[in-house]
A protein has these predicted regions:
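Hydrophobic H-region at the start of alpha-helical membrane spans
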Residues: 27-37
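Compact, glycine-rich, soluble single-domain proteins
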Residues: 2, 29, 40-176
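N-terminal Lys/Arg-rich, disordered targeting/topogenic segments
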Residues: 1-28
Length: 176
């Protein structure tokens, strides 16, 4: 969003320079066209450029279309502020190194299963993690931690790990 604000400030300066009484109408029209193009590109970046990359992952014998949380901002947001997740969809976090990353349900609107992964093997599953009651202060949110150091996490719809028979010891892999 900061880059979008910079674009808007730049556009304000640009418009203030082109809206002068001594500018010919042709240049003013050209300036307006450039302004419109820049605004459209800025909006396109804001709404399309921030989409998460989609990959296919395999957990046991099950394939999911997983959104990849790559940046720190994407990892912090996760599935927050969404109303649902398709049954065959997931959110994938790759931390690059082992650690005890904690997860919370801030802004979540639906329950999930959190699958803890270490070296491409499931080492734990936090099942049916509930969405918090709206208005719950951040300080009151429960933190969920893996049973041991992990390097990856997969979030899926609540109950799906039981329904699909996903269990500790199953293998995880990226299909594409």
């Amino acid at each position: 969003m900061k880059s979008f604000r910079k674009i808007i400030l730049g556009l304000k300066q640009f418009v203030s320079q082109i809206v002068r009484p001594n500018i010919r109408p042709g240049r003013m029209f050209l300036g307006a066209i450039v302004f419109i193009i820049v605004v459209i590109l800025g909006l396109a970046y804001a709404f399309v450029g921030n989409k998460n990359k989609i990959i296919s992952v395999k957990v046991g014998e099950n394939i999911f279309r997983a959104e990849v949380a790559e940046t720190m901002a994407q990892k912090a947001k996760g599935l927050s502020y969404r109303d649902s997740l398709d049954k065959d969809s997931a959110m994938y976090f790759d931390f690059g190194q082992e650690g005890g990353q904690g997860f919370w349900m801030m802004g979540m609107r639906f329950p999930i299963d959190i699958i803890w992964i270490k070296n491409n093997v499931i080492v734990g599953i936090e099942k049916n993690v509930p969405a918090p009651t709206p208005g719950t202060p951040e300080s009151a949110l429960k933190l969920y931690y893996p049973p041991e150091a992990i390097d990856k996490v997969l979030e899926i719809n609540a109950g799906l790990s039981d329904e699909l028979g996903i269990k500790v010891g199953d293998y995880f892999s990226i299909v594409n």
